[in-house]
UniProtKB/Swiss-Prot annotation:
Major localization class: cytoplasm
Bilayer-spanning residue ranges: none
Quaternary structure and interacting proteins, as annotated: Monomer and trimer; forms heterotrimers with PEPCK1 and PEPCK3.
Keyword Lyase among record annotations: yes
Chain's role: Inorganic pyrophosphate (PPi)-dependent phosphoenolpyruvate carboxykinase, which regulates the carbon flow of the central metabolism by fixing CO(2) to phosphoenolpyruvate to produce oxaloacetate. Can also produce pyruvate and diphosphate from phosphoenolpyruvate and phosphate.
Organism of provenance: Entamoeba histolytica (strain ATCC 30459 / HM-1:IMSS / ABRM)
Keyword Cytoplasm: yes
Keywords: Coiled coil, Cytoplasm, Decarboxylase, Lyase
The enzyme's E.C. designation: 4.1.1.38
EC class (word): lyase
Species classification: Eukaryota, Amoebozoa, Evosea, Archamoebae, Mastigamoebida
Protein name listed in UniProt: PPi-type phosphoenolpyruvate carboxykinase 2
Coiled-coil blocks: 1085-1131
Family assignment from sequence similarity: Belongs to the PPi-type phosphoenolpyruvate carboxykinase family.
Amino acid sequence: MFNQEQGTDYPVLNKKKLESLANLKLAMGGHEYPTDDLTQQGLKLAGPLLEEVEESEVNHTTAPIDARLQTFLNSYFAECGEEVPKIPDDTFILDREGLGRVLSFPPHKQEFFCETMKSYKIKQGVLHNPAKDKRTTVGVFHICQSDVPVPADKIECPKIAFLRMLKAAFYGAPDDHLIIPYTAECKEPTRSWVSLYMRPVVVPGVKGVKGFEHEKATEMHFFVPGNMVSCLDFVESVFGNAGNPRLSKNDAALDPLGWTGHSGMAILAPHLTRMTKKECGLPHISQATERQKRERMCWEKEDELYNDGKTFKMYCRDASGVICTIIADNYFGYCKKEVKTQISYSANLYGFAEEEHAGGAVTRPSYDLGEACKAVQYAEGYKFSEMVEKNKHSIIVKEEGYAVDKKYPEGIIYVPEDSVFTIEDASIKFNHNGKEESILLTPKVNYVLPNGYTIILHDTMTSRRWTLRGILPQYTLCHKPCTVSGGGKSEISKSIRDAVIEGSVFVNNKEEDFKAVQEIFDHDFSKRYANGEVKPIHILDPNVTLGTVVELLTPSHLFTKEHNDYISSISPLIVELVMTIKSLYREDWKGDWQSRITVDKINGNEGNELKYRGANLCSQYLRVGFERDETTWRVFQLRKDFFPAAKLQMEDDITASVIVPTKLLKTPINNMQKKACKIVKNCELRLFQRPDDAVFRGFDKQTEYDFSIPGHFISNYQPMTREEAKDFTKDVVRLYQYTEPMRKCLQDFVAGKDEAKYIVSSSYTRLVPEGDKLVGSKNPRYLQRRPDMLDPEYTYMTFKAIQLYRKISDEEPLYTPVDAVLSGRRNNPPQVAKNGMKLRPLSVFAPLHYFELPELLMECITSMTGASPSMFGAGSEGALTKGPFNSLPAVVDLNNYLLGMICCGYSGFVSSASYCGPHYKVAHDISLLIPEIWSKMRRYEQEPKYLIEHGYLEPCPDVTYNGKTYSGKRLGYRITTAFANHFLRTLFSMPNSVMPEDFLKPELQDLAIYADSYEYMSQTDKGIAMNYVKDGTVEGACPPLKALIYIMANGEYNGMTRESKEFREMFDPEVVLNSEWYKERLVTRQKLEVAKLNKDLAYLNKTIAEKPRLVETLNKQIAAVKEELQYVSSEEYLIDIDGSIGTDPYPYKCMKH
């Protein structure tokens, strides 16, 4: 269904066929359907067959998942003494991808309006604007009483209330909510529930590793009233479609090695906000418990509405592996987050794995290599012949001595290590069998050296039109977990390209400026070091890199005062000229650079714009935040060899990760010294993007391109008719601020070049009420196809380069685990929210901090955030930012996170978004910058120990204000001026100008605000920790986490404080991995898996007895399960999984039976 040519999805679906399928399914259910000739003819022919199907077993069989869910509900609510509602088995099942989109509109209408949604067919796909434009997390999450405690940050719901809500959801849905939009124009519209079956990933598979090789998914059945079918279109677009749940081939229990053993259900029922507390069975206030009074889960007046008539999500679950959810709203964010919640539930019960609120990307450094280069300097130690031998199954060797890729022969060409690339004659030359061979150098082709180093002829991001771009095979997988809303999860994987600005290179006076440049080239730099070391250097020496020149011209504590004074006296314009000439200079110029760099004559006088080979020379600049007025951009010149890092997105929001002992891997990874590593998988097929910067026309090029093509699912934008679009585009100046794709899309629509009635613009968000006026929504959204799926050749090339670099064959497994953990926080100065509430400042963070494990866990436990456009309010987002979406006690997630960090030996860094301190607004500029820096750092430079020893990280200082001292220990370490000068030189021409001292030290911006921020953070730490103590879930925390929570809440634990040596030793890897509680987790994982596999065998045998036709298929499954059972039951299994996180026994210990 994916159209590679158009770069989008749904246009390749045959709309007519899907409509015919919808008609057929309606007819089978005895419903009226919109008529068309094709369907009429088909139904006449298929009449007898339809009668047979109606009588068939499938039509009247309860889906296996529904049987599992019903068994759970009957057992769970047996004590209530009331009827348990039956899960509907006559729903309209979306068993084909795209069917939900067709059902969302009447076939001959361009819009559909109802109480909960306004929907439009637009030029770019579909636009759905739900009643609310964002979600809230305040008072929303309710959990039904069970053996597993309900955390204090959730509202506890009595079983009877959930049961009555469930009845009202299924039996009390208003008639108009049940109308399927597709049939809305029929005389008798179809009123029905619509459902979708999904199998979202929970545990990624690890190829070749026994016990970890099978990818495992949970199962979920999602029910919505008919007119909310667009919510299922949305969910399907993100998580996929697992087909008809009634069919045996789709029964998760018949795929036991690919199933976690867990099942879930979700029901949309916005009408439930009208139910009263009394109707739900909540007690009168005179009979209520203290918790019920505190949470308002009781009533005084009979007409009081449940949850005060506001949105809520209600869970019922225990540790048996079944979860059911009722959602009293239809905002898309709730639907997506519900699937996330159920993935998280399954991961926490299964073990080995985590569901993470994370973004991430494989990031490879990239450089401008100029107009010519020799491959030998980039592929030292690698031979073309050896590469060919190891890649027999994936490449075709040509007789001229090069090779092409079997899968992408036109886009990927493998060349020998002695290749010479030259743009001037568009050639790649190399020796083969004693003679020189030559092939044509063409754009957009990956020329791959034997070590995976990739060279591409490129025409953008350069100071001249054509250049050679080199991409290293060495990579860093930057993983951004525990990242708050608006903290930059998506940005870590976005190319920085969109943020780069280009401008011409100027001189004030050519003769004088060239003379100043030559003086720098002739300057004696040998005595620059303060320690007296003599190191002669000549800038134009071909052995001197551009990075060395940047270092040479950047003030440093390593240099003498005289040298620092000298380079500080050089004007930025002259520095830019020096860098420009250095980047262009070739050895055969023999020192004569002045004749090659020219200016035009204008009106008889020399101009100011420099040219090379007749083309204007360009410089590139990058924004890093705003000045204090919050409108003036802080823009800095990039190095002349700058190219954005080559990024491959691995995560965006919902990540399934598994921690695997390194000893089990079949091939090497970046760091074999660690006990374990984390392997991640993106659970989403499409990404629910919020393109904040698209409101600035022309800035977000990717969004503007996406909005120029059809097939998208869009929300919270303002629809425009052709007339409205005509008025919108009359402002020609602003129209031409868009990039060409968006501008042309609008112009084509206005010109009537298509049948669409509506269009949206990427900068024109939905108008929503704010007080007495309408303003643009701050939460515009659209579903973007995953970049790695949009460009499969680039994805393939990324992993191929890594495989070649590691010298492993094309048949061996390739592992790309996480290398760096870089979480994100969203900061803010003191603010007043739209509802008038004052938001306290969160202004203590520098651009980047490093935390030792206790302080990192404190960050993760509270997950504080400033205001975000995604939701209402600010404050704590709960443990690991998953508070609102965790149906089990958060200590389970925190235990897993802590163990994962220890097993894998990861270091915890946290970057800033929105603000650095109260006065430097940075938006997502830091989020984009960090992966660029990290990709260019050597592996040892990424280690905190090295950074601290070399002065690149410093402990945050204690700060005193109004006689009170605030300990810097809570804030860990932060980057220094030395870090900025040293590591930013890989990106910027003048790195010392990018991050001034008060940018790196927020207390210098405003001490009062800094102190208030610290107070706010301390109070939140204490308050959140007290919740774990009050609800008793602290007892489920592993020993170091338990001690930390008590210290956060009370200041000490068993005589230990956060500074105590014995407390900090509790986090020592050797202590943790040799502890009894860790060993118990491994045994728990073994016991659970043995029990599950035995249950699987019983189900398979039962199914064979009931359905003999499946005997051949199921016998294979039985053999595989028996083999797995034998291994899992062995002592070998316990030894093998040592280094994994095992399974947390806490939820199971809570169960009373």
